[in-house]
Amino acid sequence: MEKHIWEHKKVNTNYYEERPWGSFEHLLDEDYCKVKRIIVKPGQRLSYQYHYKRDECWVIVQGKATVTLDDKVFTYLEGQVVQIEYGTKHRVQNEEEEDLIFIETQTGNYFGEDDIVRIEDDYGRDSNEN
């Protein structure tokens, strides 16, 4: 009988950052993907942006998300999935009275926060500003 040895790799999941719209924490940070838990406070929204080097997949886990994709607005509920290909302009907004929480999975060849091209930002941030 063949023995299977599983190597457990410890991932630093303690990275947490607050932003004007809410917060995020890293759940997984690898060369091939990055996974974040993102919380958007009531009445807040992220910048309208796009990326050159990564796709994103959002799974809504709490609340209702108002999502803009290339100037078209959609509503997503808990359990629904938003697929965002690189180059797609996108934004998520929380118009509800409770926190919006979603899991973001990034795939591509670069996941740095400097791969954000901001088109519009409620907080006056430039493209490479957090």
Predicted features and spans:
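Glycine- and acidic-residue-biased ligand/ion/polar-headgroup-sensing regions
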Residues: 52-66, 70-71
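A generic "binding-loop/recognition-motif" signal
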Residues: 44, 53-54, 72, 88-89, ...
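A short glycine-rich, His/Asp/Glu-containing loop-to-beta-strand
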Residues: 12-50, 54
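Short, surface-exposed charged micro-motifs
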Residues: 37, 57, 66, 81, ...
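Double-stranded beta-helix
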Residues: 2-18, 91-130
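Short acidic-glycine-tyrosine-enriched beta hairpin
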Residues: 71-89
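Short beta-strand His + acidic residue motifs that chelate non-heme Fe in jelly-roll/DSBH
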Residues: 47-49, 67-68, 84, 90-96, ...
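Short beta-strand segments
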Residues: 46, 72-74, 115
